[in-house]
Amino acid sequence: MTETRLVIFDCDGVLVDSEPISVNVLVKAMNDLGVPITEDEVYGRFLGKSLATVIETMKSDYHVHAGEEFLERMRVDLYGRFRKELRPIEGIGETIDALDIPCCVASSSQVERIKLSLSVTGLIGKLPNIFSASMVKNGKPAPDLFLHAAREMQVEPKNCVVVEDSPAGIEAAKAAGMRVFAFTGGSHANFEGYRAELDRLSPEAVFDVMPELIHLIQKQKLDGMHP
């Protein structure tokens, strides 16, 4: 078993329990522009993907142009709710401390949003290395973001473990040649078809309590010692 030298965390739904807030804000904004979409549809189509992808889909599938006004309204509404409602995933701080392995964040969100999420939830000091899809050409499910993070952290892809909650993120990690663990402990994990889609992608492990990650990493170390 290859040694784990870097753990790459997705942000939304893995570090912070943000997906229900984000999806609610996005659906309302899309509905107001005349896009007839539900929260379940947004989860199924856009979980783990960038806002740029959402905007492209609105244009191609619904012939709706989302301009600066849409983006600014989304930002104001979302950030306001994050400051009031956002919570960390239970046990994430203790888990990061216990891992004793370099960690970083690689998210489809903008850097500003990632930093706000981590600041509000008290995690910013534990995760200073932040990488956003805005830093690469192609977002998830392309491998670009994870490869960029590994390169910046000076770790080979084969020595990285990615912790993801989205199908797009799992696909991206696999395409990058990294091992991937699927976390299903976020509040959004009960939407229809979610678990089935994750299982279809065959992540190396699926877990729903964050401290379990410590044992998964330790198990890899033991497996490496006893082939």
Kindly give the residue locations of the regions a language model identified:
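Asp-based, Mg2+/Mn2+-dependent phosphohydrolase catalytic module
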Residues: 1-5, 93, 97, 110-111, ...
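Short beta->alpha linker loops
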Residues: 21, 46, 50, 73, ...
